[in-house]
Amino acid sequence: MTFRFLRQIGAFAAASLLCAVPASAQDEPFDEYLESVAMKARSEGVRQSAIDSVFTGLTPNDRVLALDRENVSSSGSGTSTGFPSMAGYLARHNTASRINGGVRKLAQVRSIGAEVERQYGVPAEIIVAIWGHETAYGQVMGGFDLPRSLATLAWEGRRRALFERELIDVLKMVDQGVPRSRLEGSWAGAFGNGQFLPSVYLRLAVDGDGDGSRDIWNSDVDTMHSIANYFRDAGWRTGEPWAVRAYVPNSADRSGIENHVNSPVCPRVHERHSRWLTVREWRERGVEPRSPIADDTMAALFEPDGPAEPGYLLTQNYRVILEYNCSNYYAMSVGLLADEISR
């Protein structure tokens, strides 16, 4: 799931823990709530026929509410960093099956990938790695009815502004010709090979094959173009690696590399990275990249499982992967999967 949106979910969830629980959703009948959304959608130009095709017969989904309330990160087993083991996470997520599937998918889309890389500057293996992590290369896209899920989450009320916007954007998708029957995905409203949200689909999905539809469900071309467009929009730097593994000796000079900047987004993710230095400056401190990278590249040191374990010099492109899902575990697994499938 793209996560600029996940970031918003996390922020709203955290806020909800600090304030009183709002009035029950049942205080406002579901049908009345849908009518209020329909009025807003009409004011934004959505035709009544699209609204009727989506809202007719819609009911709340109790399973979605249960999943939303259970959506709490597990603490996991700690390491010297106080965080769950990155090595353990990678063993569970970058499996032989996922790697082999990525190799096959990359071969299948090789010509598309070359075209996409020329147009957007994003390597095909990065796009395929996202595809693999999000939906197992299209095999698991979710079976929840998207309008029902989004309407339920918006009606429930804790994050109404967030989910109501996505619900209205689903109506816009249908108004623009997306078949109602295609609107299935995750319980939180993400869909398609890349697990876009409706707002992301409307803004960044691409009709890569020129057939008149932005089909991120069935078209490899549209999927590749759309994920690449997301990355370009988020600031991907052409020709720069996402990270390089680095040798960090025990004697490395660690003085003055702490990151004292409090990130306004995902602070617990970014606080684990050092401050930014050039690769040349890292070399002067004894940190040696294991792969080619320009000396003037800005990079942050990240030792996910602590000193004496693998270290990485992260570039700006790592931050772009975080835009898709703001988790060090996710971003590392995507980057390393991309490296594996492109060997």
Identify what each model region corresponds to:
Residues 41, 50-60, 121-138, 170-173, ...:
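Short, functionally critical alpha-helical segments immediately adjacent to catalytic or ligand/cofactor-binding
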Residues 2-11:
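Bacterial N-terminal signal peptides that target proteins for export
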Residues 21-25:
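Sec/Tat signal peptide C-region and signal peptidase I cleavage site
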Residues 145-154, 167, 191-206, 227:
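Substrate-binding/active-site groove segments that recognize
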Residues 249-343:
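C-terminal soluble interaction/assembly domains
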Residues 208-216:
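Acidic, glycine-anchored loop motifs typical of Ca2+
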Residues 26-117:
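An acidic, Gly/Ser/Thr/Pro-rich helix-cap/linker signature
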Residues 10-20:
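Bacterial N-terminal signal peptides
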